[in-house]
Amino acid sequence: MGAFGLVCSAKDQLTNQAVAVKKIMKPFSTPVLSKRTYRELKLLKHLRHENIISLSDIFISPLEDIYFVTELLGTDLHRLLTSRPLEKQFIQYFLYQILRGLKYIHSAGVVHRDLKPSNILVNENCDLKICDFGLARIQDPQVTGYVSTRYYRAPEIMLTWQKYDVEVDIWSAGCIFAEMLEGKPLFPGKDHVNQFSIITELLGTPPDDVIQTICSENTLRFVQPLPKRERQPLANKFKNAEPEAVDLLENMLVFDPRKRVRAEQALAHPYLAPYHDPTDEPIAEEKFDWSFNDADLPVDTWKIMMYSEILDYHNVDAAAQDAPESNGS
């Protein structure tokens, strides 16, 4: 079961390949759900990268349920982490692919916002793909409320509830990296207050300039009286990890998002040297068009837009299949 749909495996009778089918039930029941479904479809159409789940078909049933058909990967990182400890080379390779995907996503002007092990799919060849873009948003938005799963939520989301950018995905990736190293979640908060407390136990109290960016008076009243805590060396917690792994993690789990490492910088870190190839870490050809995102439209309008996108997808797909192959003449 996904965030707002049911996912099952099936076989494509034309290609004989296994696929995943995500059923969005009653997508036009509310404007919010209509918009979210439209956003996910637009993103899946736009984002084309080896480390991002790819859309292979989409259709609407007579009852107006929507079906996204994507490639099928055998498992996800959450299942892998709960089944056995990961060996060093797998941790490196998985982190590399996560960051390679994030570099592309961020270059398209997109923030995933809900990166967590269950949204990271893996196949038997250890190929990794990021999925579930239902919560994705434009970079640097004015947003309200909590979005991502608590354990992987960046502190600026908890502290400000207002502005955040691509760095929230780097924090989430850092939490996932730590979980791969340790075999258990790094910050398993019971609620957002407990979550923040666990983070400060390891990373210390947020710097004053970070606290000054807090927009919510309630959050300020909670944070300012807290006792000062010093940042603990991550090497003390991750005693079995390589120094280079700990150093990269230190650069990903930074309270101040402005000082957090970017995806392309993390890819160039010595820890990922066995896989890093700057000529094979592509960025998006163009930014994603977010012009629809602030629209407050009725369900019927979202429905028309959705049907238009689906028709466009099938027309483009048919044109690509009908196009004559180049013979070099």
Swiss-Prot record:
Keyword Phosphoprotein among record annotations: yes
Enzyme Commission code: 2.7.11.24
Catalytic activity: L-seryl-[protein] + ATP = O-phospho-L-seryl-[protein] + ADP + H(+); L-threonyl-[protein] + ATP = O-phospho-L-threonyl-[protein] + ADP + H(+)
Residues modified to Phosphotyrosine: 146
Modification after translation (UniProt): Dually phosphorylated on Thr-144 and Tyr-146, which activates the enzyme.
Every Protein kinase domain range: 1-272
Broad enzyme group: transferase
Regulation of its function: Activated by tyrosine and threonine phosphorylation.
Matches recorded under SMART domains: S_TKc
Residues that hold ATP according to the record: 1-7, 22
Cysteines paired by S-S bonds: none
Top-rank taxon, per record: Eukaryota
Annotated motif TXY, positions: 144-146
Primary role: Proline-directed serine/threonine-protein kinase involved in a signal transduction pathway that is activated by changes in the osmolarity of the extracellular environment. Controls osmotic regulation of transcription of target genes.
Domain notes: The TXY motif contains the threonine and tyrosine residues whose phosphorylation activates the MAP kinases.
Name this polypeptide is given: Mitogen-activated protein kinase HOG1
Organism: Exserohilum turcicum (Northern leaf blight fungus)
Lineage: Eukaryota, Fungi, Dikarya, Ascomycota, Pezizomycotina
